């Protein structure tokens, strides 16, 4: 099939790479978000999808909004049979959805109808789920509500962060997306409506969501940190200064809530239940470092607390 692929961030790359290599399909263009300022140098950066398309000489379309008439005209000229989507990052108008004869097929990183929305991987970890997965479905007007073509499951390890889990889902999901497109082309795959029960939503995660609430149980603290790692990142305040947190270890010891205790064996913080041991932390303006190194340099006073 003639494909116009829509995607933007790194997790979309395995899918595009797989479809470029497919002997059955031809990627005639990609649609991605416009170049953006990124990094400490504040340089204009192309999206990972645009960069991969450039490597293969594939035309790149970067409309400010997919409702632009110029974009819709260009998409019509390309005459795609289908438009696969992986984390594109913008809502598609009905005028765009109507152009390809097989519509737009989205790869979503959850087991729909659970965790519709922008941050399904983070939501699954934060909820303490043991199994998640990826789903391919036909895009329609509702939010991630279209009929489903296929699913694949993935175990959530107790040490998984959003980053490690999404990396695996991006690879397994890419295989699912290719299989789905093959079935759609052959006419052997029919989409089925999503269940009306079990619907949940996963809104975009903000930097404020990364602030850790130490009045929560240790298990909830652990899950929250893993869910926002690597982005937007977990953080707390110590002496009024922001401290970024890496994943923590659950321990059996008790400490008063929010109290920091420095020992030879590590840096511990009290929660609503048991304590957690900090692994790596990042003070403002510095790199990630072992928590003990930070604590020694910070010269914390007895009874110091996280805020």
From Swiss-Prot:
EC number annotated for this UniProt entry: 2.1.2.9
Catalyzed reactions per annotation: L-methionyl-tRNA(fMet) + (6R)-10-formyltetrahydrofolate = N-formyl-L-methionyl-tRNA(fMet) + (6S)-5,6,7,8-tetrahydrofolate + H(+)
A Gene Ontology cellular-component term: cytosol
Transmembrane annotation, as ranges: none
Keywords, in A-Z order: Protein biosynthesis, Transferase
GO terms assigned for molecular function: methionyl-tRNA formyltransferase activity
Superkingdom classification of source: Bacteria
Enzyme class, first EC level, given as a word: transferase
Residues annotated to bind (6S)-5,6,7,8-tetrahydrofolate: 110-113
CDD domains: FMT_core_Met-tRNA-FMT_N (cd08646), Met_tRNA_FMT_C (cd08704)
Known role: Attaches a formyl group to the free amino group of methionyl-tRNA(fMet). The formyl group appears to play a dual role in the initiator identity of N-formylmethionyl-tRNA by promoting its recognition by IF2 and preventing the misappropriation of this tRNA by the elongation apparatus.
Recorded family membership: Belongs to the Fmt family.
Name by which UniProt lists this protein: Methionyl-tRNA formyltransferase
Organism per entry: Nocardia farcinica (strain IFM 10152)
Gene: fmt
